[in-house]
Amino acid sequence: RLQRKAENGLRGIVLDLRNNPGGVLDAAVAVSDAFLDRGRVVSASGRTDESQLEFDAQPGDVLEGAPIVVLVDEGSASASEIVAGALQDHQRAVIMGRRTFGKGSVQTIVPIGRQAAIKITTARYYTPSGSSIQASGIEPDILLAPVKVELTDSSQDTVRESQLEGHLTNDAAGETT
């Protein structure tokens, strides 16, 4: 769908990774790869041969070079840092916001018997430039000051759906419009 929009004159995108705690490595690689034409996406290095991993982008940037802005903050961690780091190192996106969390470790689930397992750290992630994300995070290209959001008293100026003309009712509860 994004590729269709790019073909129809998409001028750029904003990828909002703020407060994104991460997820699956394969998904982070796939998202990064979608916007990169070539090069390293991420690597991992640990004590064993099995923990030495390298992921490279395949040819084909779905945006065909259209600008990307990635928003990050201290809640951006793990897989979201992989995406931000890859796009930053390849100068494919401008990273804006605040320094990310710094969760650059690889966890592996090791079975213990039939019904139990433990999760242990087995490696560290590295951006394409070779920087470790662990405990340092991704430093934005453009640092933004935190925005203070003040919530108003919920009893003030509150409009409930039931106050709106033509609102839907719960027929099972015997309400009528």
Predicted regions and their residues:
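C-terminal "post-core" interaction segments
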Residues: 1-177
